[in-house]
Amino acid sequence: MSADLTHNQPSVEAPPSGGASHFGEPAWAKLCSFATMLEDEGDMRGLLGPRELERLWSRHLLNSLAIEPDIPASASVADIGSGAGFPGIILAIVRSDLSICLIETMDRRVQWLEEVVKKLDLPHVQVFNMRAEELAGQAHFDVVTARAVAPLKKLIPWAFPLLKPAGALVALKGARAEIEIDEARKMIRKFSINSVTIHERSVWGTDEATRVVKAYAV
């Protein structure tokens, strides 16, 4: 009798219905293609844990869009620590008006991001294999984004040298957002940040609220 090899395999979360109507057919098709790539290769390539497939759409793909309303039209965006592509690739799929720079230090993740950009035909996206600190002084952006990269006290000194005057750091954060802000007071003063706010966001296709931290330069 052969063993059931699928018994311990995690299930893959199905996409919510109505995506084509909400995002438009082209963007929805790319989101689904990206999801399939992650289902097929995410665990094998060390991009997502196997159990993350059980909440791929709600926790990762759609959750990334909580920051989309905070990004102005035709903005330049730097995504620090893009990893598997959250939120940078997701933003690129739904916002073709943006110019997006994905910043990632790990070679295998850089290779993955380059493959995704090519396969999904995202000409408005560039991938940089470097640390954010190395890009400082070479380029400046309207918005810097980040998700699950570092606490704010570390993220702020990486992000603010990359921002244009009046630019904004927009970060996806969890329950510790207030604590992270308190712990980052020294960096907030150092970089003359005049506004740090927390926003609770509902995201289409999910039942969970997401917290977004926005910090503005003077």
Which residue ranges define each predicted feature?
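Class I SAM-dependent transferase core
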Residues: 1-74, 78, 93-94, 108-125
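Conserved beta-strand/loop positions that form the S-adenosyl-L-methionine
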Residues: 80-82
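Conserved SAM-binding loop of SAM-dependent methyltransferases across substrates and taxa
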Residues: 84-97
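Helix-to-beta-strand junctions that scaffold the AdoMet/dcAdoMet cofactor pocket
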Residues: 95, 163-165
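Conserved SAM-binding motif I beta-strand of class I
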Residues: 99-104
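A short acidic, Gly/Pro-enriched loop at the edge of an enzyme's catalytic core
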Residues: 133-143
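Conserved beta-strand signature within the Rossmann-like core of class I S-adenosyl-L-methionine
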Residues: 166-176
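Active-site capping/gating segments
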Residues: 176-218
